């Protein structure tokens, strides 16, 4: 027993020195993770740089003794465990320790699972149970939150937590939505009141271009410029074709008369001033909000309350000719034919 303890002490001291030299923990060296990492480094260096394993060990800063301790620590632990089993009969402790270090990521104990099948662990999927039994998750959550033995404090704690989550998560979201809604409503209301209270003026600028084009083509004379030039040459006068001749050129006696009439028309005052739309007060003196009929679809559109009747009024319903079938046309022609025949019969009767 003393020899086993001495070997174990020497192994612990050696592993501790190797851990201090390499930076790995004792558990990593005992589990073999340090040896695996060092072997990967050595293999990569030997493959990339084309050096031997001894040179690779020296390149990463390890001595052959330290490398031997790191690679032989797991086997030495297993050998000491077997020695302790033969000497003192405490093999279970060594076996469990060696298995713990070799399988470091194992976190669930499997002792007694074969002897007690009812202790086996299974995955819990609450979604499946909620599909089979709707509402079971809510019931389970309430049971977990409320303790039947101390239902008062647990109920107060659950309510306070729910209120805190409401204040922390839901209240800022609701507040931002309400602020956004109020801002939009205020902007639309302000714009609608501005459109109601402002002074509107009729402006014909967009249609002036079309009116001028219409006037130009309507004022063109049916007489060609070549004919006008011939008349001017015959009378010995000069004609400037920059002028647009009026419709009365046909009844003019000479080119001078045409030019005089053109100058007189240009001197006439051409009024393009706008007319203000008169504001009317609310009927009955109730000081209600009023708006012209042509502005009503715009204001209701800002408030989002456009009715189908206003849409039809604004867009103007499409006028489609109703097609008549042959049967309906024949039926329509029937009374006319009968009236004609009766008229003919009456004429015949009068002749006879």
From Swiss-Prot:
Covalently attached lipid (N-myristoyl glycine), positions:
2
Q: Which GO terms describe its biological process?
A: monoatomic ion transmembrane transport; symbiont entry into host cell via permeabilization of host membrane; viral penetration into host nucleus; virion attachment to host cell
> What are the recorded GO MF terms, alphabetically?
channel activity; DNA binding; structural molecule activity
Q: Which UniProt keywords apply?
A: Capsid protein, DNA-binding, Host endoplasmic reticulum, Host membrane, Host nucleus, Host-virus interaction, Ion channel, Ion transport, Late protein, Lipoprotein, Membrane, Myristate, Transmembrane, Transmembrane helix, Transport, Viral attachment to host cell, Viral ion channel, Viral penetration into host cytoplasm, Viral penetration into host nucleus, Viral penetration via permeabilization of host membrane, Viral release from host cell, Virion, Virus entry into host cell
- Region ranges (D1): 273-308
Q: GO cellular-component terms in the record?
A: host cell; host cell endoplasmic reticulum membrane; host cell nucleus; membrane; viral capsid
**Matching InterPro entries, A to Z?**
Polyoma_coat_VP2 (IPR001070)
Residue ranges, annotated region (Disordered): 312-352
What highest taxon heads this organism's lineage?
Answer: Viruses
Q: Name one Pfam family in it.
A: Polyoma_coat2
Query: Where does the record place Basic residues bias?
Result: 342-352
Per UniProt, the short sequence motif Nuclear localization signal occupies residue numbers 316-324
Renumbered to this chain, region (DNA-binding) spans: 313-352
Residue spans crossing the bilayer: 290-310
Task: Tell me which family the UniProt entry assigns to this protein.
Answer: Belongs to the polyomaviruses capsid protein VP2 family.
Descriptive protein name = Minor capsid protein VP2
- Species assigned in the record: Simian virus 12 (strain wt100)
